[in-house]
Amino acid sequence: MKDSDHWVVGICPDDPLAGKKYIEKKELLDKPLILPERMGVQSELANWFGKDFSNLDISFISDLGTNAGVMAANGLGYPISIEGAVKYWREDILVQRRLYPEITANCVIAWRRNIPYSQAVNKMIEEINAFRA
């Protein structure tokens, strides 16, 4: 498992931004953005955008990556998400470019020990522990 995930912006492949290796904040200031709904995540993005956050064109709020991807593919906005959140999109429909300066998120998986689990939960824990070895 990765130690951290990178934040990216979803872009239509014919958009001029799609030709860039990474996207800087100044390139998003006039774009309609699709942001995650969770306040903790918005707070991280607010820190990244700094004083410009209050002036952003936030067109949609969505925690559903597929919905945000469909909106982006139809020219309705630029979703900001964790890299790979919509990794099954073909690159001829939607590409992802990392934000610069880099912004990352650390993920934590936790579970209670010494309680009965379903077979599916036991298998998931087994898979997670395989990465720790």
Predicted regions and their residues:
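Flexible hinge/capping segments at coil-to-helix
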Residues: M1-W7, I11-L33, E37
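Alpha-helix boundary recognition
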Residues: L29, G50, A72-A73, N129
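Beta-alpha-beta core module
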Residues: M1-H6, K20, E27, T66-N114
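Secondary-structure junction motif
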Residues: K31-F53, Y117-V121, I125
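Short beta-strand-to-loop elements that line the ligand-binding cleft
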Residues: L35, S54-N67
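Short secondary-structure boundary segments
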Residues: P13, G40, I82-A85
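Generic preference for hydrophobic
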Residues: V9-G10, L33, I58, I80, ...
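Extended ligand-binding regions for polar small-molecule ligands
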Residues: K26, N106, A110-A133
